[in-house]
Amino acid sequence: MVSNVRNDVTGNWRIATIAENIEMQDYALDYYKGYFKSDDEIHAIVNFNYKTTTKISVMGNLLDVSVYEYVDKEEHDAKLLFSGKLLKEYHVNKDTGEIEEIQ
């Protein structure tokens, strides 16, 4: 279930929590097609299995998929979201599904 983020001042942040063995860079395009209502949105997916928070945002024809270390209780406050250490970043082509590791 995707919901709004508490204390988000932009109105564009959404959050979902999961406990799955999913690599978000592989799932990002399907997630985008299913849950994004606007390319202005920024989505956070907290995965309690991996203790990560993934940020998905749109950059033209690419999805920017950034995976961060999970910070305790960050799912409850926009000010804490994405405050963990950046672990990996990927670009996913929205047209082809091609995944490029950025860092």
Predicted regions, residues:
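Short, non-transmembrane alpha-helical segments in secretory-pathway proteins
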Residues: 1-52
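Short, low-complexity, Pro/Ser/Thr/Gly-rich segments in the mature regions of secreted, periplasmic
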Residues: 91-103
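Intrinsic-disorder/low-complexity loop/linker signature
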Residues: 11, 60-61, 97
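Exposed beta-strand-loop-beta-strand "reactive/processing" segments of non-cytosolic proteins
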Residues: 44-92
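Contiguous hydrophobic segments
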Residues: 21, 74-76, 100
